[in-house]
Every structure is written in C-alpha cells, then in structure tokens.
C-alpha cells in the first residue's frame, strides 16, 4: 500500500461520518482523542525499564489489586487527554473507586467514557502484550452525570475499542458498523487501517482459559473443557489447543483474527462473586466488538450486553468468541442450571 493511499483513522472516521450519518462529529473527535492517548501509553510502555515506570506503585486500586506504576500513568494519560475536549460529561476507570466528572472550568459534552487503562498489567514487567480497553455511552442526563448515568446495559454503547501494545501497536474499533483494525505507523505517528470488517470464524479448535483453576470450576465449564481436552477420542471428535496469555486484550485479539473462545468463569472459591472480569470496563466493550465481528458473548446464562449493571465495578463471568463454541458452553449452563 503506497503512503499516499493509506487510510488513517481520522480519514476513516470522517468517511464513516459522511457515509452512514450515524457518527456525530463529537463522537468522532472523542475517538480520536482516545486513540491519541493510546499512542502516548504505547510510547511509555515501549520504554520499559528505560522509562523507570516498571514495578509496583505501592498502592491498591478499588478492586484490591496491587497497582503497577504504568497502571497509574496510563490512567492519568487518559484522564488528562479527555477532560478538556468538550465531548464528555464524565469518565469512569477500573483504577478509580468513583467516576470522574469533567471539571467545571472545561466545557462538557454528552458522552461518558469508561476504560481499563492498562489491561493485563501483571505482564508489564515480563514484556508480554498488554492493552487499553474503552467504551463510550451517551449520558442519559444530558451533561450532568451521576454514577447511575453509567449503569447502562452494553446494548447502549455507541463505540468500543481496545489497543494492544505488542510487537505492533494496534487499535481495534467498532461504532456499531463492523470492526476495523488500525496499526500505529511510528514513523509518521498515524493509525493506519490494516484490517477491515474483521470476522471471527464460527467454529474453532482453540480455547483460552486459566487451566490452573480447573479444580474450582462449576460442572458446565468442567464438562466443556474436558470434552475439548479429550480430543479426537472424545465426543467432539477433534483436537483442540489451549492458548492463555493472561492478558484479555491479547487473547481476544488472537480470537478476533483466527477464531477461538475466551473463558473467564465464576468458580467455587468465591461463590458470592460472579466472576472476576469487570462488566463495564472489560466485558461490555469486548462483547460489543466480538458481536460486531460475528461472534457471541455470554455470562453462561445470558447475553453479556443485556446485563443491567448495578455498580461501576460489577463483575461477571465471561464466555466470548466463535459463535458455535460460545453457544455450546452456554447450553451446558442451561442444562445444568449452574454457573
């Protein structure tokens, strides 16, 4: 592809705005600001130990998880980049206990931005792919946001995406009209369209789950994974491979490109806590992307994007990816009426 004919993210969004009339100018500008923030995060991630940002920060987030220095830095980059643009009423982050209203000295917009600033941060110090996940909602109360303003089901998302900071830095986006992938051209500093209308194969021979938790799984998950592991000699009559990176953005990006199912189920260790992944910051945006690419996403008992949130940091079980596999494991939950 010649440099002159490359489609940048800005050009792509402007063309979408003209062609579909469902991408308002303020939403387009918001997406561009988020993408610029992801470039800044990518730069800091790539510096590694040279940037003195590796290691823990000596603090915990609202989830009770030890924060990495890059967790805090990435959160600050996203807040600073988006607070003054006039497109947002408020923001919410996995790293903050409560939401962040746009300061009174800045103009306010009609959107809400929800994000996990650095997903997979346990991998930071060992140089494994990590990323940023985000979701955009309309503020139902106009420009005056409350915590309740954020508590909308995933079906209300107007945009969602993620960036992966790996061998290449990529930015994957949906605004409800398919899924497209942009790669960061570091020489010119632009996001360039490299994959259009991405589609997840309906069938797969790969699955992603943390198998070290197998003894804690509920029966539907145990049954499903046992069938996969039985290979050609089992009821599936085919061999399956397990892939687990412990970085949701990296695992989902692989599935988006070549198929597979990602599973993070609830388990018996914490029966009062339905899963580990956050509905607002991880499950909803990834489900929007996966469904737009022809896949499926459920909690095992219902479509993730139809879950009515009850809190900013609500957790849910997650099964997403190739449609036929997600439907199979979901049917096992229905048969067993289990988690």
Curated annotation (Swiss-Prot):
Binding site for Mg(2+) 1: 94, 116, 118
EC number(s) reported in the record: 3.1.3.11
Record carries keyword Manganese: no
Cell membrane keyword on record: no
Catalytic function, reaction form: beta-D-fructose 1,6-bisphosphate + H2O = beta-D-fructose 6-phosphate + phosphate
Protein residues bound to Mg(2+) 2: 116, 119, 282
Disulfide bonds: none
Similarity section: Belongs to the FBPase class 1 family.
Record's protein name: Fructose-1,6-bisphosphatase class 1
UniProt source species: Burkholderia ambifaria (strain MC40-6)
């Amino acid at each position: 592809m010649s440099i002159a004919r490359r489609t940048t993210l800005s050009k792509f969004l402007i063309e979408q705005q003209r062609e579909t009339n469902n991408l308002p100018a303020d939403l387009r500008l918001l997406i561009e600001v988020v993408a610029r923030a992801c470039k800044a995060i990518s730069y800091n991630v790539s510096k590694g130990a040279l940037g003195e940002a590796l290691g823990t920060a000596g603090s915990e987030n609202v989830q009770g998880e030890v924060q990495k220095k890059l967790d805090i830095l990435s959160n600050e980059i996203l807040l600073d980049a988006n607070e003054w643009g006039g497109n947002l009423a408020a923001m919410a982050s996995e790293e903050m206990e409560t939401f962040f209203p746009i300061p009174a000295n800045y103009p306010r917009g009609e959107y809400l931005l929800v994000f996990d600033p650095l997903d997979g941060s346990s991998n930071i110090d060992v140089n494994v792919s990590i990323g940023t996940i985000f979701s955009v909602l309309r503020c139902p109360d106009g420009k005056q946001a409350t915590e309740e303003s954020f508590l909308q089901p995933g079906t209300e998302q107007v945009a969602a995406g993620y960036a992966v900071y790996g061998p290449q830095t990529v930015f994957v986006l949906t605004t409800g009209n398919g899924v497209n992938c942009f790669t960061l051209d570091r020489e010119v500093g632009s996001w360039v369209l490299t994959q259009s209308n991405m589609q997840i194969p309906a069938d797969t021979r790969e699955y992603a789950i943390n198998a070290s938790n197998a003894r804690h799984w509920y029966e539907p998950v145990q049954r499903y994974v046992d069938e996969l592991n039985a290979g050609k000699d089992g009821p599936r009559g085919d061999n399956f491979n397990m892939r687990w990176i412990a970085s949701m953005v990296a695992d989902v990006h692989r599935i988006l490109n070549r198929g597979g199912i990602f599973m993070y189920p609830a388990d018996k260790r914490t029966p009062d806590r339905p899963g580990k992944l956050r509905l607002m910051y991880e499950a909803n945006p990834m489900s929007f992307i996966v469904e737009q690419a022809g896949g499926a996403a459920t909690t095992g008992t219902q479509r993730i994007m139809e879950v009515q949130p009850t809190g900013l940091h609500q957790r849910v079980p997650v099964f997403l990816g190739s449609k036929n596999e997600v439907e199979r494991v979901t049917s096992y939950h229905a048969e067993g009426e289990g988690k």
